[in-house]
From Swiss-Prot:
Cited InterPro entries: DCN-prot (IPR014764), DCN1-like_PONY (IPR042460), PONY_dom (IPR005176)
Position of sequence motif Nuclear localization signal: 214-221
GO CC term (a single one): nucleus
Record localization: Nucleus
Domain of life: Eukaryota
PROSITE patterns according to UniProt: DCUN1
Domain commentary: The DCUN1 domain, also known as PONY domain, mediates the interaction with different cullins.
Renumbered residue ranges of the record's region Disordered: 214-251
Residue ranges of every copy of the DCUN1 domain listed in the record: 1-180
Protein name: Defective in cullin neddylation protein AAR3
Alphabetically ordered keywords of this record: Auxin signaling pathway, Nucleus, Ubl conjugation pathway
């Protein structure tokens, strides 16, 4: 190993700094059509990554020490707050796990890396790693590596938030099928309110501890590119149907509390729930009041 002063200064922090700078240039080129100059810049970025990988392989001849270095770097970065920083670090881990110029990384190295960087972030991490260890026969590509991060952000323990029509790698689709076979028909329905009372609507939502600027359904669903928001579309259609029913009721009587009727017509409302009984009583009173107005 080269023990020169230059090599000694080329530690994990410097490697990470250079990697992030190169990736920033690549992402900038990817966001807009590349002209001749931009295309040349992109090619230079690819060459820079190749050269950086060569330096890494010379610096860390004992490849097992890479995870010690990554852990040291991870403890110094503010990854819990800045997700952009974490995404760059996550890609950097894949880069550091590459060997002999290969574009993919080995299964054992990928599993070790996932357990390092996704601990506390991926609810199905242990099941995922067990599945990969037992079923995967090929090395992990960079695209699959990045898709696993997206999957970890949008899918809950009960697989709510997973879109079977999404552009997931086959490996992730196979994992989901495997999880369905384990979970069976029993779904956790306790996450959804069955009373239909709008004042109790808060039971349908939970605040995300790291993203408190919005409220989201407690399904683990994130607003990320490529994820089809089927649930939101379905809810919008249900709300339109409810609004039409409210307007019809308004034409028959102006004495009703339309908000409560709309609530009781919610698909989440049980036929024997308090709001369902209240709706029947309200309709009965409306009929009586309407009859009483006649001369």
């Amino acid at each position: 190993m080269d023990s020169s002063p230059v090599s000694a200064r080329f530690d994990i922090f410097e490697i990470y700094r250079r990697f992030c700078a190169i990736r920033s240039g690549q992402q900038l080129c990817n966001k807009k059509p590349c002209d001749g100059e931009e295309s040349q810049r992109f090619n230079l970025s690819k060459e820079a990554i190749t050269q950086l990988l060569y330096l890494v392989e010379n610096k860390f001849q004992a490849r097992n020490s890479i995870f010690d270095e990554l852990f040291k770097l991870m403890s110094r970065l503010d990854l819990m707050v800045d997700f952009t920083e974490f995404t760059c670090f996550y890609d950097f881990v894949f880069f550091m796990c590459r060997e002999n110029g290969q574009k993919n990384i080995t299964i054992s190295r990928a599993i070790t890396a996932w357990k390092l960087v996704l601990a506390g972030r991926f609810r199905l991490l242990n099941r995922w790693c067990d599945f990969i260890e037992k079923n995967q026969r090929h090395n992990i590509s960079e695209d699959t590596w990045q898709q696993v991060l997206a999957f970890s952000r949008c899918v809950h323990e009960n697989l709510e938030g997973y879109d079977s029509e999404g552009a997931w790698p086959v490996l992730i689709d196979d994992f989901v099928e495997h999880m369905y076979s384990i979970l069976g028909p029993n779904k956790d329905t306790s996450l959804f309110c069955k009373c239909g009372d709008t004042e109790s609507e808060s039971c349908l939502y939970q605040e995300d501890e790291h993203h408190k600027d919005y409220r989201r359904p407690h399904t683990g669903l994130r607003n990320i590119p490529g994820l089809k928001r089927k649930t939101s579309k379905k809810n919008d259609e249900e709300e339109e149907d409810e609004d039409e029913e409210v307007l019809e009721t308004q034409n028959s009587s102006s004495l009703l509390n339309f908000k409560r009727i709309k609530t009781s017509n919610s698909p989440r409302c049980s036929s024997k729930s308090p709001c369902s009984i209240e709706r029947s009583l309200s309709q009965g009173f409306a009929s009586l009041l309407s009859t009483g107005d006649k001369p």
